[in-house]
Amino acid sequence: MGVPVNSLASPRFCGVRTFQRLPHSADCSGNDFAVLGVPFDTATSYRPGCRFGPAAIRDASSILKSYHSVLDVDIFEHCQGVDAGDVDIIPGYLDESFERIDAAVAGVLDAGAVPVIMGGDHSITLPELRALSLIHI
């Protein structure tokens, strides 16, 4: 677990859209990192739409390769991760959504994984930092 699907076994355009074709799992334990989407744009100051960011990043990441030819390193030989899906935010409700973001990030941290967070608007940094501060301060 924790490594992407082999594109020789399953074409890149097939399957559930996850970041870099990682396994999808809400259980992050036993992994080094967990990708977490935060499709939130309630606090955007001009034009909404960044809520579609996590889906667009996942879609584009399906063609990424884990091997870097210049450095001769495959990231998944050194770490493993999962795509933990998106936080179920509540459009239009800032405080309640922040509580859910905070809880989701805390859940990843409690499982011993590093959260890799894709957003959303700039405001999602606050609940993320609140969750991180509980273990790093």
Where are the model-predicted features located?
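Helix-loop module immediately N-terminal to the HCX5R catalytic loop
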Residues: 95-106
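Conserved small/polar residues in nucleotide/adenosyl-binding loops
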Residues: 135-137
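Glycine-rich beta-strand-to-loop/alpha-helix junction loops that act as flexible
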Residues: 118-121
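Glycine-rich phosphate-binding loop signature in dinucleotide/nucleotide-binding domains
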Residues: 108-113
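N-terminal glycine-rich anion-binding loop in soluble enzyme alpha/beta folds
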Residues: 2-95
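Residue-level preference for the first positions of well-ordered beta-strands
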Residues: 33, 114-115
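Metal-dependent catalytic neighborhoods of phosphoester/phosphodiester hydrolases
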Residues: 129-130
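Short, well-ordered alpha-helical microsegments
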Residues: 125-126
